[in-house]
A protein has these predicted regions:
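Von Willebrand factor
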Residues: 56-113, 117, 122, 134-153, ...
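Conserved P-loop NTPase mechanochemical-coupling segment
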Residues: 33, 122-123
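Acidic, polar low-complexity linker/tail segments
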Residues: 3-63, 72-75
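VWA/integrin I-like adhesion module and closely mimicked acidic/polar interface patches used
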Residues: 97, 156-193
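Short, flexible loop segments at the rims of nucleotide/cofactor-binding pockets, characterized by
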Residues: 42, 124-129
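Short, solvent-exposed polar/charged micro-motifs at secondary-structure junctions
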Residues: 46-49, 107-110, 160
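Phosphate/oxyanion-binding active-site loops and adjacent basic polyanion-contact surfaces
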Residues: 19, 76, 128-132
């Protein structure tokens, strides 16, 4: 097959979904929508019927872990924190349990709309090996049960990837295009140009 045709086939077989959009869609899926008579649906007014309207709970509640093992540099940490800020900027109200990890958990904080400026002074800690399991151990010990757990990592765990049954997980992998978690969703971080 000629080279130009091979390139076309490669382009067609390697779909690229914007990983930020994938995360946004995943977070959006956990926002509760419910019916309420507090905001009646106007569509039924002309017929004299009062129908409930949609009540949107725009608060997101997620956990985010930053891999700060020895293979992650300061620039990677800065990129990861910038992406977390980007997630916060998309929503009016949020609660993000944020921490760093290597073989242990460090600097766990809850970031909300009220203290969002704390993210600017957040200090990533770590620098040792990489134990993904430490995240699930910490969540279980601290009774943290997220609807979504987002891990920013380079995708090189020493051991297992974590507990596939505990929570819905998204692995955002930077610098390791071959990484594929055995559960959850794996998205490859690609810097947009």
């Amino acid at each position: 097959v000629p080279g130009q045709i091979q390139r076309m086939i490669k382009d067609l077989t390697e779909p690229k979904m914007n990983w930020r959009e994938l995360i946004r869609m995943n977070i959006q899926s956990i926002i509760r929508n419910d019916y309420s008579f507090m905001r009646p649906n106007r569509k039924g007014w002309h017929s004299g019927a009062i129908l409930p309207g949609m009540k949107n709970d725009e608060t997101i509640d997620v956990c985010v872990a930053i891999d700060m093992s020895g293979s992650i540099g300061d620039e990677d940490a800065k990129v990861f924190l910038s992406e977390i800020k980007g997630i916060m900027d998309q929503y009016q109200d949020f609660s993000i349990n944020l921490w760093c990890f290597d073989t242990d958990i460090y600097n766990a904080q809850k970031i909300t709309h009220d203290n969002s400026e704390d993210l600017l002074s957040y200090e990533p800690m770590g620098g040792g090996g990489t134990d993904f399991e430490a995240n699930w151990t910490w969540m279980k010990e601290n009774d943290v049960q997220p609807k979504k757990f987002i891990m920013f990592t380079d995708g090189y765990p020493c051991g297992g990837w974590g507990d596939p049954d505990y929570c819905d997980t998204i692995f955002v992998v930077k610098g390791n295009k071959d990484a594929e978690a055995p559960f959850g969703q794996t998205v490859i971080y690609e810097k947009e140009v």
